[in-house]
Regions:
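Beta1-alpha1 glycine-rich phosphate/pyrophosphate-binding loop at the start
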Residues: 6-33, 62-74, 83-85, 112, ...
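Local cysteine-cluster metal-coordination motifs and their immediate loop/turn environment
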Residues: 45-64, 89-112
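Glycine-/small-residue-rich beta->alpha transition segments that form the dinucleotide
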Residues: 234, 238-245, 293, 387-401
Length: 470
């Protein structure tokens, strides 16, 4: 049957059904439903199959988006799944957590005037459905090379690296200090965005491909790094960034001020029925979350589900210039979060414990060299907003392991591991200053998206294959 070139005129953009806010705040699970076969095909057929698909370029892993949309529209699900996995280790996860409005869907030709193709939801449908029907990556033609690589960190970068290695006949052994794989996918991102059985299923898939996981193991404590260098042909570092960025204003040390990541991690661990001594319950409290990224939205929506009396989110720029996903802001707003735009915190106030936060109104100045407009304080605009708890979500900075320098792994002034993504004469992609050690993800580029970490892990694996000459 010939493609209907004007499908996008006859069929508008349709997203999977979303639970009503009043219902979803009472539960911890994902809020979006799934496409069925017909719905996914109808939405996929809206794709114009552009000659130079900007959506593909805008995607950090450069997914073959028009190609697998076409396969879905034709009912070729397994081929679509195989194609999706050629570029992405975690397509069903990226389909859930990527800010598609800033990436592929934001670049879709139909986005202006007709509504972008629902790329993320179709991506999720492809892998969820294929895996549920028994599809698995075809490893039948892989020939073992006898080479072994240790991967430190079972987050997106480490999983991406291990995936590419085993597909090329290299044994990948992934070490992680946590009791389950996924890194922040499991312990940072809340269940309402990513249910943990999805990550566990991906672990099963990777183990079926030959990836070995060694969990509850802290490198440098439980196993010396030197041992890995002796036992393996190469080592990949994908340990992420976990140290929060402080605001640098008075009162950050008061009782009732919480860091975003420990707050989220402890909440996830409690839901997973794991030991969570740092668990904080904000039920009945007036909460202010500081920040405008996706982590801030996760904190906002978690506090709502815990039963906070009120949740306000203060961000120093306006809504148009916030870094987070528009979808997540809308979800938070629907669930009862109040946004305080152009408010910059200058002090946490209270007698020993949080009683409020002093903010100043801002105006945006001229764009800097990166194109971002800097907030400027408006004189005389200070005000105090009542609060019982403050959650700081200003992002994360690298926290390099103390043993890096012992093994010739250089870091830059910002604490990031030096591992250039481009190969040069005598070096391989994502190779550190120790030729046997590679690195990728947030610890190289700084805190970023899941999908960028996947891409760097996969590219680092290609660099390792070059280094091993396999």
């Amino acid at each position: 049957m010939a493609k209907n070139t004007f499908q996008f005129l006859e069929v508008g953009r349709v997203d999977p059904k979303k639970l009503d806010a009043a219902e979803r705040v009472k539960r911890s699970g994902e809020i979006y439903g799934n496409f069925d076969k017909e719905g996914a095909a109808d939405q996929s057929e809206r794709c114009l199959e552009c000659g130079n698909p900007y959506c593909e370029w805008k995607c950090p892993v450069h997914n073959y988006i028009p190609n697998w949309l076409k396969l879905v529209s034709e009912g070729n699900l397994e081929q679509a799944a195989e194609l999706a996995h050629q570029t992405n280790t975690l397509p069903e996860i990226c389909g859930r957590v990527c800010p598609q409005d800033r990436l592929c869907e934001g670049a879709c030709t139909l986005n202006d005037g007709f509504g972008a193709v629902t790329i993320g939801s179709v991506e999720k449908y492809i892998t969820d459905t294929a895996l549920d029907q028994g599809w698995r990556p075809d490893m039948s033609k892989v020939v073992a090379t006898g080479k072994r690589v240790a991967v430190i960190g079972a987050g997106p970068a480490g999983l991406g690296c291990a995936d590419v290695l085993v597909r090329n006949g290299v044994q990948a052994v992934v070490y992680d200090k946590n009791p389950e794989v996924g890194g922040l996918l499991t312990f940072g991102i809340p269940e309402f965005k990513l249910e943990k059985n999805v990550v566990k299923r991906r672990r099963d898939v990777l183990e079926g491909m030959g990836v070995e996981f060694v969990l509850n193991t802290d490198i440098g404590t439980d196993i010396k790094f030197e041992q890995l260098l002796e036992e393996y042909d190469a080592v990949f570092l994908g340990m992420g960034t976990y140290t929060y960025m402080k605001g640098g204003f008075p009162g950050e040390d008061k009782d009732g001020v919480y860091e975003a990541l420990p707050y989220l991690v402890a909440n996830n661990k409690q839901q997973l029925e794991l030991d969570s001594p740092d668990y904080v319950d904000l039920a009945g409290q007036k909460v202010i979350v500081l920040g405008g990224g996706d982590t801030a939205m996760d904190c906002n929506r978690t506090a709502i589900r815990q039963g906070a009396d009120s949740v306000q989110c203060a961000y120093r720029r306006d809504e148009e210039n916030m870094p987070g996903s528009r979808r997540e802001v809308n979800n938070a707003r629907e669930e009862g979060v109040e946004f305080l735009w152009n408010r910059q915190p200058i002090e946490v106030v209270g007698n020993g414990k949080v009683e409020g936060i002093k903010v100043v109104t801002t105006e945006l100045g001229e764009p800097d060299e990166r194109g971002r407009r800097s907030p400027q304080a408006v004189p005389g605009s200070e005000e105090i907003i009542d609060a019982d708890a403050v959650v700081i979500a200003f992002g994360f900075r690298p926290s390099p392991a103390p043993w890096f320098s012992d093994y010739g792994v250089d870091i830059d002034d910002g604490g990031r591991v030096v591992a250039p993504e481009e190969a040069s004469e005598g070096t391989c992609a994502f190779q550190t200053t120790n030729p046997k050690i590679f690195a990728g993800g947030d610890m190289v580029r700084g805190s970023d998206l899941v999908v960028t970490a996947v891409w760097e892990g996969r590219q680092a694996a290609e660099g390792i294959l070059d280094y091993l000459a396999v």
